[in-house]
Amino acid sequence: MAVENKDARPGKALKKESQPLIIAKTPAEEQRLKLERLMRNPDKAAPIPEKPKEWNPRAPPEFVRDVMGSSAGAGSGEFHVYRHLRRREYQRQDFLERLSEKQKLDEEYKEKLIENQKAAEDRTAKRRKKREKLKQKKLMAKKAKMESQKEEDSEKSSSSSASEGEEKDDDAEVPSFIMGKR
């Protein structure tokens, strides 16, 4: 019942079954293949690339020895040196402009966040004040209702003691209608 080895050499391990070569035709298929390869061994760590570092230009030299230009007096090789220096300086200036633009946008974004947060707090405070006002009105209405009930109860109790004497006289009357009799 052992698996037969084609090479039949002792001590040689069996080869893994080779996966058929699949060429991705669409980006979605390529992503699916990558995910399948990752999920074959979920214990293995997945490679996550780090964010590339931002390019920084070289600082301009503090002291320039050979100041030259693209004038006719320069030698044939000097023009190329000048051209490279000029290109490097333009790159540095472009970088500084982009950096200042990015900082400006960041500042505007932070200001807008602060402004939005302040507006939200103002709206919340206004609504909170309105809720508190309604709550106070309800409490005052409830207190007024309780006081009016107390006054009515006190009036009823004083009027009920006066009307008790009248009720005794009313009880003495003979009812004109009695249920159950015909």
Swiss-Prot record:
It comes from the Eukaryota. GO terms for biological process: mRNA processing; RNA splicing. Residues 1-18, 27-43, 114-124, 144-156 have a biased composition (Basic and acidic residues). Keywords: Coiled coil, mRNA processing, mRNA splicing, Nucleus, Spliceosome. Its main location: nucleus. GO terms for cellular component: nucleolus; spliceosomal complex. InterPro entries: Prkrip1 (IPR009548). Residues 1-80, 114-182 are annotated as: Disordered. One of its GO terms (molecular function) is protein kinase inhibitor activity. Residues 164-173 have a biased composition (Acidic residues). Residues 126-138 are annotated as: Required for nuclear localization. PANTHER family: PRKR-INTERACTING PROTEIN 1. Belongs to the PRKRIP1 family. Required for pre-mRNA splicing as component of the spliceosome. Binds double-stranded RNA. This is PRKR-interacting protein 1 homolog. It comes from Danio rerio. The gene is prkrip1.
